Amino acid sequence: MKSRIECIPLEDAVRLGSEMGIGAVQAGKNAFRTLACHPDLVRHVYGLLTMLATRNKLASRLRELIIMRIGWTTGSEYEWFQHYEIATTRAGVSPEEILAVRDWRKSELFGPAERAVLAAVDD
């Protein structure tokens, strides 16, 4: 699939990421490389995303379930693909739970807190 907006070259993204304190792996991702077409924008957006990801009161497991549900309901293959690994390796979400996010109301894998956040996503 061809991007609708071209990404900046990987080397440029890594250099900009380094200036911002972002590692090469993160700076090499398409989302960063696309936003980096506008360096001022990427600085602000990544500042906001970092704050949301690191200074919130939501457990990482719940956050990733929310992201996976949003990815599923919006048909975002990119979001689903990017966060599958994060959810399974860093947030303690099993592959079975990720698949169950698609039709979570019928699943017995989720407790009350998880069901509440998944319902909030659907609302």
Please place each PLM-identified region on the residue numbering.
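Mobile cap/lid helix-loop segments that border enzyme active or cofactor-binding sites
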Residues: 1-60, 89, 112, 116
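Short, intrinsically disordered/low-complexity patches at protein termini
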Residues: 9-10, 67, 86-87, 120-123
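Short alpha-helical scaffolding segments that buttress acidic/His motifs in well-ordered protein cores
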Residues: 35, 45, 49-52, 65-71, ...
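Short helix-to-loop capping/linker segments positioned immediately adjacent to catalytic or ligand/cofactor-binding
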Residues: 52-56, 73-74, 107-108
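Conserved alpha-helical segments that form or flank metal/cofactor-binding pockets of metalloenzymes
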Residues: 58, 62-65, 70-98
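Residues forming well-ordered secondary-structure scaffolds
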Residues: 82, 96, 112, 116-119
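Acidic/His metal-coordination segments adjacent to aromatic residues that form catalytic metal sites
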Residues: 101-112
